[in-house]
Regions:
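Short beta->alpha junction loops/turns
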Residues: 69, 105, 233, 271, ...
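C-terminal coupling/interaction segments
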Residues: 270-314
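ABC transporter nucleotide-binding domain
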Residues: 172-269
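ABC transporter nucleotide-binding domains
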Residues: 2-7, 12-211
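Residues at or immediately flanking beta-strands
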Residues: 61, 94, 227, 288-291
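A generic structural signal for secondary-structure junctions
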Residues: 81, 107, 220-224, 253, ...
């Protein structure tokens, strides 16, 4: 498998002081859907703009399909389709006119009618952009990225604000591009989206990659297999912290402990060993269990454990 995107020791410093990217290295294979996750200010946008050739790094090397921006920028731009989180499209144009406009920027674009059909926009081809729904606008933004017949698709928060049906329609479009051999670099605030779409992903914080791998491997390696969430209170209905976190950490099969949304969350391998010991510990404290649930560990658990906050809190 060939390498589609590669960067080595990427650094970007603003005003000689603020380090937005700190020695970041990535290698994305052709045909992969790769996710870049991180809180606001983590360096994701700066990294992507450097990879897209829009921003010059302070130091480090970038290679797109084996070529450098310094040597072959004009041809390389033909290979990239870019859809930003809030792509600004003229409301005075029709859907067809918008796609035709973007197609005119490239030497060998795809058929506009073909792209409109693929994005399920044929019936809206003569509608004004200003009259489209949120989901239709997002599909149009992706259409403007696909009409150039790209080899690599950069998608920045492609489904933000969409209803579940519109999100799934875009997921199928992304999967279709990937099935045809395309490479996708995706940023998203939706953990379920990253788990469903991404073959591999990297979590970025403070300009550095702090974890990288497939969603399943990251969950297994960093999130535990299961999560036990609980809250306790005093028997007299007063508040009780229910013991320090260190007290829960010594329970059987517990890998990590954190406070999460007013509850204690335990990452565990074998909940059938943890829960009886937890109930016994709560009883010995003289406390009352107010809430108890178990679930499969998720990518969200990995993110919270690594960064200390939920991605949607940003």
């Amino acid at each position: 498998m060939t390498v589609a995107i590669q960067c080595r020791d990427l650094r970007k410093t603003y005003d000689g002081k603020v380090e937005a990217v700190r020695g970041l290295s990535l290698e994305i294979q052709t045909g992969e859907c790769f996710g870049l996750l991180g809180p606001n200010g983590a360096g994701k946008t700066t990294t992507i703009e450097i990879l897209e050739g829009l921003l010059e790094p302070t130091s480090g090397e970038v290679s797109i399909l084996g070529h450098s921006w310094r040597e072959n920028a004009r041809e390389m731009r033909e290979w990239l389709g870019i859809s930003l989180q809030e792509t600004r499209l003229s409301e005075k144009l029709t859907v067809r006119e918008t796609v035709e406009l973007f197609a005119s920027f490239y030497r060998e674009p795809r058929s506009c009618e073909e792209v409109l059909e693929e994005l399920q926009l044929t019936e809206k081809a003569d509608a004004w952009v200003g009259k489209l729904s949120g989901g239709q606008r997002q599909r149009l933004a992706v259409a403007t990225a696909l009409v150039c017949n790209p080899k690599i698709l950069f998608l920045d928060e492609p489904t933000t604000g969409l209803d579940p049906q519109s999100r799934r329609q875009l997921w199928e479009i992304i999967r279709g591009f990937q099935r045809d051999g395309g490479t996708v670099l995706l940023t998203t605030h939706y953990m379920d989206e990253a788990e469903r779409l991404c073959d591999r992903l990297a979590i970025v914080d403070h300009g550095e990659i702090i974890a990288e791998g497939s969603p399943a491997s990251l969950i297994e390696r960093l999130g535990g297999h299961h999560v036990v969430e609980f809250a306790v209170g005093a028997k007299d209905n007063g508040s009780s912290e229910g013991g320090a976190l260190a007290e829960w950490r010594v329970l059987p099969s517990v890998e990590s402990v954190r406070e999460d949304d007013g509850m204690v969350a335990l990452s565990v391998k074998e909940p059938h060993l943890t829960i009886p010991a937890l109930l016994d510990a709560v009883g010995k404290q003289g406390s009352v269990l107010q809430h108890l649930t178990t679930r499969q560990a998720s990518l969200e658990d990995v993110f919270v454990r690594l960064t200390g906050r939920h991605l949607r809190e940003e």
